Curated annotation (Swiss-Prot):
Location of the protein in the cell: Host endoplasmic reticulum membrane
GO biological process assignments: transport of virus in host, cell to cell
Organism field: Maize chlorotic mottle virus (isolate United States/Kansas/1987)
Lumenal side: 31-64
Role of this protein: Required for cell-to-cell movement of virions in the host plant together with p7a.
Keyword tags: Host endoplasmic reticulum, Host membrane, Membrane, Signal-anchor, Transmembrane, Transmembrane helix, Transport, Viral movement protein
Taxonomic path: Viruses, Riboviria, Orthornavirae, Kitrinoviricota, Tolucaviricetes
UniProt name for this protein: p7b
Cellular component GO terms held in the UniProt record: host cell endoplasmic reticulum membrane; membrane
Annotated membrane topology: Single-pass type II membrane protein
Ranges annotated as spanning the membrane: 13-30
Length: 64
């Protein structure tokens, strides 16, 4: 995430907005691909995968 060109002179709300759009688009892509994968797997396996994914993302964001 550090390689994203966000200038430190930009206002805080603008940086938050850009980061929010990036994170939400990444999550959207992840859930879209997970949905297509879920068709071929059992729902229980899919739900376990989803919770692990979101836990990893939350831990990563909390460590900033």
């Amino acid at each position: 995430m550090e390689c994203v060109c966000v200038d430190s002179s930009w206002p805080q709300w603008l940086r938050n907005l850009i980061l929010g759009i990036l994170i939400s688009s990444i999550l959207f892509i992840l859930t879209k691909t997970q949905d297509t994968v879920a068709v071929y797997h059992e729902p229980s396996v899919y739900s376990i995968d989803q919770t692990q994914k979101f836990q990893k993302i939350d831990i990563h964001n909390g460590g900033k």
